[in-house]
């Protein structure tokens, strides 16, 4: 890196590329070749790869030249230069820079072998190529070409235009080829894949022109690919496309899994429903007329009869005949019809399960949930309601799981991309630092030299002047720095002028503070501020602050954004889109907020000075209101107009020229809060980010010239503009005027004015929301006047602010610009009110609603998230737009003609339907609809007119690319911009907005008034002094009680306060109000004698060292001991942790079985009778009774009994359907049961009251729920007894009994967990819901403006036909017809309309969920004017309104729910997760590895049989190859099943039968062989039992197929189940790791998903009972018919399951909205006393909307949250070095070495075992040394325990870690628990010690031998005898110390005593847990 970084940047780097340069390169190439002769062997190739230099990422072609290189010297733009990148020193390349400093790299070899780099033609080509105008022209050409492509019938002359385009593209390619060369060397034309695209497009153009290829239109569609050229022209798009391609690669595993799962489900569907969807009701018996007999010669044609449509039963108003089934729960036929297989399948024959391919399509449709309610209803009608189970499985496993896996994968890919970007940025920062250090050194040297020259203390000016004169003096530092990009003279002159001006102005004003002369040459004044209490003597310079706002400096964002400060991107907004920032979401983007880019970094001096002239504190003009840093500022600062309308000028906030340099400003209340001593220095804040070191070094390094440069680059406007601004936009003409300004400023900036304006906004919104149709003229008049008034108010506000702030500063603030825009529009609208067609301007008034965002953080956050996403998504949106465009054009070119020619196939009137591709707009709409997820219906039309293959391909591509990939990437970006930090930032930003301030002021006022009244009362009614104190005491009691219970705020009584004369309290009393701004709405302001400690989250306070001592010292003379509570938990979250009191259970071991007090202390004090003596008399009996009740209630059986009762009572509710009247017995039983249940529940409640006492009972939310439900039952019981059961109110109370099942919630742990999590999320869900409502309000009001009253139409009810415009034009025409005695004609409204805002909301909900939206859109598109008959597509561009709403209203807001829920769960996990947070990543990995290996134990392998033949079979069966062969057979069997179709011939059927027989024989053989080899052990393995059952069923199925099919399901289904065995094969395939991860994620999510499923079932249960009691008798129409209705419990559940995914809820709602005359109030229902079939619109809307919000938005999104969470965990685990499978294989191999499962292995086998393992645990031979080094403990008999080996091997893979021991201990406990072993083995030695013993024995032997040899004894026998004895002796001696020292070694084999201790501890722990569980129960 050193070489690369220290390449000297600056003007010297720019060297023109000359023939000498080329010669140098060639010389270097030759040298390098000589240096490194190529290696003969390829052995170390890889290492070389790593060590090779890599190209510098900042100097890549296409990127901007890094800032550090300065400006390009004159004359070197567009001239070939030598390459900057050292990497290319030995390659023939050169670079060229254009004016925008973009870098282009070319090959220095001759282009096309002719044109050298110095050739004139090539140089001209290069100049053209790199010029920005050239790319602009190409861009414009492409866009124009795109416009021409959208013509459906191009005019004649367009042919010539076509040639022009081709010519331009050819010219472009030629220029590129001449400039770059064609294809041989690097950087030539064809080396860039995007150029391949260009090349192919041009070739196609010429081929189609000169060669006749038949179908031209298909080839013309390839021209569309030209649109893709935009991607190659706009640099940022390439990155996004790269990311898309990455995510598609990552999706491969998910795709495989998806296809596999869908295939399995499709096979099941094929077997279950083959041919069912052709069942129709045919006229029966046949009417044998003459028509069927031709002169008696020909018989009856059965085929023709059943395929004749006229013989089918058609439901009125439906296009398809009615389906039916022959099972009891399927759809039935009416009288006179018989159910039989006839005709084709529904939907042109494309919806069926007749062949595998159609079944697969149906399943894909189910997975994407498009119009699946139709498939669901058809299938249940044809096959029976029981098959709902199939759909539940597919929707939950297929749809929710797989689709969200796609989302998870895309999100992960995005996250990885983001990480890479961040790392790159950090690396750049390091490089930048190194460069700056170098510059600094140069500069310091220069300055030292300068100092030496200029004797002593000459000012900087003098030095500069000397430099200017150039008399032997060194150059000024700015020149030395090599950054000097402009003539230094210019800059120096400017500096001088500025300095003089500053000095003169400073003198004039006589600044009280000393103005320091500029220490830096940037002309900025640095002021030294000393903090009041002199705790810090640091000079605070503006330079330090200005640094804070360098784009990308680490302090710019509030989060720890890792931004780069390397590639400074010249003038703010025009940054290079291809930069590393492309993918960054808002947090990590290089320049935090987009506003941040808009401002110049430094303030024009003059503006600053002027500004301060009336600020009253001119010296401090820079830091107006900066109380945070300078708390002792005078109050007068408040008037300074730098304050924006919010009263806040923040460093990073809404950017303003001034704001960028100011420290954060605060409000008056905060100034008061922070006492004079509080030390709030922003350096402290910087340190808190853990970046101090980096910051300091950068601060010291950024050179003055660099800052100067920045200043230049940040000023976007020419100097004349600033002059103009100073003269005309800053009004300071007269002292009186300034006085007036101050007064206006005081008024306008007051928080109360803000409050008033906010109230006006809310009122104005209300006024706009009150518009409806039809309105009375008076009401209309009121609204018009209201509008004028509000316009007036807002205009006045704007003008006053303009006066107060000056236009220049007014428009620096984003909100003000917004206000100004809206006010101008409103005024314009007033002027143009009467102009026709401009009523749309009224819609702009709606934008006022957004002004609420200023004071409503969540709305602000939502807008920010949308803003950030749109920002970060800018490129993605462009890519999406290009995709939509391309597909729309392709669709139009390919299918447009077909739609016109074959229109009669899809339309009865032979008119083009609404959805077609005949022109571009409609084609675009179809593609957009596919992106919304609705593809199947338009695809059927397409397939019918244009053939199946092409349509399937195009639609699937749009669906997969557009919907599944790009839209999920959108969602991933949304979720990422939703990170917790955003929420935290909005929750409490430390800053209070004016609204909060005004509310606090009002509260203070009220509190003050209370105190005054209190004092007044006391003065009048003179009482004793004791009484005087008492109310305060009581107040304290109450407050303390309430606060301690609920708010988690510690309160300390301050005992010695004194009263002063007016009854307020001195000392703490008066002052505490200043400091406490309590979230709990100031609950203690009224009580001035409390010191309150409010916890502030550490991570949240903007300045960490907030010294609270000051607060207490000021408030309390003795100095109270209150410090800030560090352990607070409100870390920016949306849920509050419970007060700590609850977390520490008070230990009461001996008396925890005693009941709690009955009443609260307050009650006992007031009513003495509540207090009884429990020692004697009645009190004692009462106490015994309570204890008995307590024992009963706490008993497990009691709880079980109650759960049983709850389930029974809930079940009883399910019987109360419409048939209950006819079933007298059941009805009577239910009535009695109801009473019994009520009595039991009342008894239970009384018992609990007695046992727990009222306090405990009524402080538990679950008990409240029980209480309310029991109360409802009791009321209805009493009402029945008194005979009031028919009263409406009592009836509706009875429906509330549906809530009974809710009681089950608290009883089932799983559901309770989910509900608790949900309850935690409710506040933020409600918040988002509210924001969504506000957001939708705008669209709703707009809808009312556009469509109110326009949805009515004239309609003939008998023929069900709408009148055309020429027959009936408007309402009056229709009424005339009605008067003409035509009873069947009506003027009717669409049920879902925009007549008022409420109705608009419902319509928008349908559009957002894409259900029923078509009818709403059609009505809008046909609308004309209020009360006019609609005209078909007369208002076609109204589609755009819906498109915009879908993007913003549906897309962003609905996905926001997912964001909020995921975010919330993560936060709750953080708070309550415990162990996860306190572990490092390493520990987690260890812990997971250990967790996995602890639960396993070595199993005894199945012993090999002794019989020889059995043994051979055993070996054969247990081989892996055998398993794989069987798997392949299973797959083949599946393939043969796929071949089956409904219409197959007899011959085919026979072939399939025999093939199947062969497979059955194979599987039977497998089964028999295994049973023979494995003997009785065969049945100890689950999979074998499964196989056995399947084989038996298959054999039985072969013989009894007919009988089984008649009574049960088709036997082939069992074969499908066999597919489950494929799961086993996955372990054997190494490549399937990704799929294993996905399945593992599913397994991990199952428990949580089961809990959510339970909760969902409970919700469905309650709603279906509610639906039965309210909508049972609704008229059958739309989505409600004889099968799908609310008449019985089963039917209700079927309907509600369908709505869980929001499918078809519009159809179910429509009949419920019926009112007479659409329904009858007197209709009789046989067998029931109920009359009428009308619905109840309000109840219906509430029912469906609440159900959709609960199920579709919340519960289903919880499902998504869990899948995303577990997927990331599973991915992490699969990335771990050790996975589950590795441990599995470890144990499998272990079994071979330890056949008896003793858990020990002999030392001698260890080396073989280690070698037999698989990677990564394997220790390959030779491994003796390594195994010895592991120091494994051994027990007697030289055996080693398996867990010790596993630990050692794991440690070897994962590396050592200090925390291993603790984890290890836990693992051992687990292992010992799961493998209770009778014998305890104590280790006596270890492998290392054993080796040491062996080695020492050998050494001793050698020594002794030598000793003997020296002594001369050579008699062998004696020697050997002695040696043997000595050896064993010594060995024994050696071993004693080893055993003694061993117990310290921590292994699994532990002494018994320790185990007993552990067991004892475990028992204690269990007892404690049981106690806690008892207490948690109600």
UniProtKB/Swiss-Prot annotation:
Polar residues compositional bias, start-end: 1936-1947
Bias-annotated ranges (Low complexity): 473-486
Entry's Gene Ontology cellular component terms: anchoring junction; cytoplasmic vesicle; dendrite; membrane; neuronal cell body; node of Ranvier; podosome; sodium channel complex
PTM notes: May be ubiquitinated by NEDD4L; which would promote its endocytosis. Phosphorylation at Ser-1495 by PKC in a highly conserved cytoplasmic loop slows inactivation of the sodium channel and reduces peak sodium currents.
Subcellular location: Cell membrane; Cell projection, Axon
Annotated residues for binding of Na(+) 2: 373
Cytoplasmic-side positions: 1-132, 180-193, 235-253, 409-751, 802-815, 856-871, 975-1197, 1248-1261, 1308-1324, 1459-1521, 1570-1581, 1630-1648, 1764-1978
Residues annotated for Na(+) 1 binding in this entry: 934, 937
Region (Disordered), start-end ranges: 1-20, 28-62, 446-530, 576-597, 1105-1146, 1924-1978
TM ranges: 133-151, 159-179, 194-211, 218-234, 254-273, 388-408, 752-770, 782-801, 816-835, 838-855, 872-890, 954-974, 1198-1215, 1229-1247, 1262-1280, 1289-1307, 1325-1344, 1437-1458, 1522-1539, 1551-1569, 1582-1599, 1613-1629, 1649-1666, 1741-1763
Record's catalysed reaction(s): Na(+)(in) = Na(+)(out)
SMART domains listed in its UniProt record: IQ
II repeats: 733-1005
Ion transport found in the keyword field: yes
Disease (UniProt): Defects in Scn8a are the cause of motor endplate disease (med). Med is a recessive neuromuscular disorder that is characterized by lack of signal transmission at the neuromuscular junction, excess preterminal arborization and degeneration of cerebellar Purkinje cells. It produces early onset progressive paralysis of hind limbs, severe muscle atrophy and juvenile lethality.
Name of this protein: Sodium channel protein type 8 subunit alpha
Chain's gene name: Scn8a
